[in-house]
C-alpha cells in the first residue's frame, strides 16, 4: 500500500512540475473594426493563451480609417515609417511569455504602426513571435517581411492571414 501511495505521489509531483514548465502564451492584437479581435479571441481559446488588446490612446474614428483620404489619420501615420501611435496603456509584463501571437489588420500592405509601438515598448528578444492578420485584399507576406526587416533581432515566424477562419483553421494555426 505504501508503495502504491509513493508511486502516486511521485507521479503527481512529476505531473505538477511538467505542468509548471509549459510555455505561457500571449495573444496581443490591434483591431480597428472588430474583425481581428474576433480572430484573436479564437486563437486565445485554441492556444489556451492570455489575451491582450493593443489599444491606441486616441481611438480611431471611421474618418481616421478612411484609406482613400490621404489626410486621414491612418493615411498620415502609414506614410511616415517612423510614426509610432501612442498606446492607451502597455501590458504590465511580457516576461512570463515564451510565445506571442501578434494580430493586426493589414494596412498599406504592412502592420499598422501601433504594432511597432507595442514591439518597441516590450522586451521580445528570445520569444517566438507569430503574426496573424486580417485583410480585405492584402496578404500577410509583406507585413512579416517588413517586421523582420525592422526587428532583425526578433524571432518572427511566417504567420498567417486569417479572414473569418473556421475552428479547424484556427486549431491548425496554433499547433
Locate the predicted segments by residue.
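Short, glycine-/small-residue-rich phosphate/pyrophosphate-handling segment
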Residues: 130-163
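Short beta-strand->loop
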Residues: 29, 104, 132-133
Amino acid at each position: 500500500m505504501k508503495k502504491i501511495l509513493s508511486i502516486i505521489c511521485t507521479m503527481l509531483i512529476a505531473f505538477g512540475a511538467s505542468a509548471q514548465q509549459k510555455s505561457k502564451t500571449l495573444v496581443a492584437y490591434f483591431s480597428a473594426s472588430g474583425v481581428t479581435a474576433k480572430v484573436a479571441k479564437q486563437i486565445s481559446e485554441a492556444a489556451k493563451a492570455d489575451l491582450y488588446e493593443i489599444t491606441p490612446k486616441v481611438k480611431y474614428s471611421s474618418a481616421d480609417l478612411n484609406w482613400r483620404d490621404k489626410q486621414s489619420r491612418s493615411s498620415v501615420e502609414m506614410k511616415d515609417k517612423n510614426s509610432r501611435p501612442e498606446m492607451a496603456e502597455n501590458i504590465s509584463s511580457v516576461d512570463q511569455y515564451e510565445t506571442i501571437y501578434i494580430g493586426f489588420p493589414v494596412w498599406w500592405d504592412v502592420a499598422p504602426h501601433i504594432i511597432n509601438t507595442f514591439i518597441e515598448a516590450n522586451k521580445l528578444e528570445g520569444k517566438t513571435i507569430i503574426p496573424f492578420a486580417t485583410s480585405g485584399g492584402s496578404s500577410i507576406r509583406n507585413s512579416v517581411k517588413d517586421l523582420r526587416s525592422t526587428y532583425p533581432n526578433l524571432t518572427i515566424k511566417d504567420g498567417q492571414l486569417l479572414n473569418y477562419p473556421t475552428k479547424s483553421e484556427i486549431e491548425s494555426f496554433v499547433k
